Amino acid sequence: MGGSAPPDSSWRGSLKVSYNVGPGFTGNFSTQKVKMHIHSTNEVTRIYNVIGTLRGAVEPDRYVILGGHRDSWVFGGIDPQSGAAVVHETVRSFGTLKKEGWRPRRTILFASWDAEEFGLLGSTEWAEDNSRLLQERGVAYINADSSIEGNYTLRVDCTPLMYSLVYNLTKELKSPDEGFEGKSLYESWTKKSPSPEFSGMPRISKLGSGNDFEVFFQRLGIASGRARYTKNWETNKFSGYPLYHSVYETYELVEKFYDPMFKYHLTVAQVRGGMVFELANSIVLPFDCRDYAVVLRKYADKIYNISMKHPQEMKTYSLSFDSLFSAVKNFTEIASKFSERLQDFDKSNPILLRMMNDQLMFLERAFIDPLGLPDRPFYRHVIYAPSSHNKYAGESFPGIYDALFDIESKVDPSKAWGDVKRQISVAAFTVQAAAETLSEVA
């Protein structure tokens, strides 16, 4: 093989060859290719989800879900067992509270999914089986896959409804990072991973796909989020982490290289567990619809700027984003008024409290289009969806974005720009309809 020499003598065998690690080959073999024959066996196998329930004391028909998968390709030292360990410890912590007489206000469901690596099968089948219940009762889903993919700083992907919850929670937790002793997790996170849009705040990314939150967020419209420790993406630009899904992804890898003291696991457990606790126990749901208004404006500006790369076509086909900007403006105003009412209403009135919480809970559902995205019926969230070109990454206003993508090479320009116009209408209608769900009840 070509490439560099092995890093250690233990990698060398007894043959009279170089034992280089690649890539490619040397000498007479440099132009040759290796042909592999792969023989796979397809069979139907039973899978098992494990669901634990901690019944709520006041609103047992409102569900907060903490879920992660336990199946792995090989040993799964990081993916998924670093996440499964956090779920187990979180369950144990809540169990200790229950033994002391405590119960959450709302019901907490703890889920261990099977067959995630085979296409998110466990979580998807369970959510489909229980879709009617979840649509009526699901408050939030917190994903608990791998707790670490590095040991540099926190990484959070979530709905904008959870931004304030995450900010407030991380301000109360101690940072595990070296050089930040005595400082909060929020401070180290902001310093190491600043938001590119909001000065003085940490980066929170959009939810994409490739994990068990997909069916809850993208299909059912249940507010979702996830947190883990990550690497420095500025210096480590490769995707994933070394040894991902390999036979070398073991407990020893975590213990010796990633988290010898398990302090990052503890921090992730505190973030995930803290989010579940607040979502299940707060009298008023810790969702802030104003944060949604802010990002909607940002996303509308972004997609408009993309479309303006084609000014002549915009004019020719009478394309306008006025309806979308108007809907975003209305959403912003109504969200602001709703937040004012949220501060002043009588929280001792159980009917009024339930009504306000329901408006918050169902806001994410309001962004769901039952028809789904064009050619992607299982993705129904109008504001967020996995990128058509990278399933793991999230895209905003995906219907418009996909319609605009590579539009100059479309065979029928009139039809292509008609599709863009149609998706603008869908987005504008959805944002306006979502705004109306926050209006004061007559």
UniProtKB/Swiss-Prot annotation:
Cofactor: Zn(2+)
Entries under InterPro entries matching the protein: Peptidase_M28 (IPR007484), Peptidase_M28B (IPR039373), TFR-like_dimer_dom (IPR007365), TFR-like_dimer_dom_sf (IPR036757)
Listed transmembrane segments: none
A Pfam match: TFR_dimer
Sugar-modified residues: 28, 151, 168, 305, 330
GO biological process terms on file: C-terminal protein deglutamylation; proteolysis
Keyword Hydrolase: yes
Positions that bind Ca(2+): 125, 128
Compartment list: Cytoplasm
E.C. number: 3.4.-.-
Alphabetical list of CDD domains matching this protein: M28_PSMA_like
Binding site for Zn(2+) 1: 69, 79, 145
Keywords from the named record: Cytoplasm, Dipeptidase, Glycoprotein, Hydrolase, Metal-binding, Metalloprotease, Multifunctional enzyme, Protease, Zinc
Residues that hold Zn(2+) 2 according to the record: 79, 117, 245
Co-factor: note: Binds 2 Zn(2+) ions per subunit. Required for NAALADase activity.
Keyword Hydrolase: yes
CC terms in the record's Gene Ontology section: cytoplasm; extracellular exosome; plasma membrane
Binding-site residues for substrate, renumbered to this chain: 116, 209-211, 226-228, 244-245, 391-392
Class of enzymatic activity (EC top level): hydrolase
GO MF annotations, alphabetized: dipeptidase activity; metal ion binding; metallocarboxypeptidase activity
Catalytic site positions: 116 (for naaladase activity), 320 (charge relay system), 358 (charge relay system), 381 (charge relay system)
Tissues in which the UniProt entry reports expression: Kidney and liver. Not expressed in the prostate.
Family as reported in the entry's similarity comment: Belongs to the peptidase M28 family. M28B subfamily.
Record function comment: Has both folate hydrolase and N-acetylated-alpha-linked-acidic dipeptidase (NAALADase) activity.
Protein name per UniProt: Putative N-acetylated-alpha-linked acidic dipeptidase
Recorded name of the encoding gene: FOLH1B
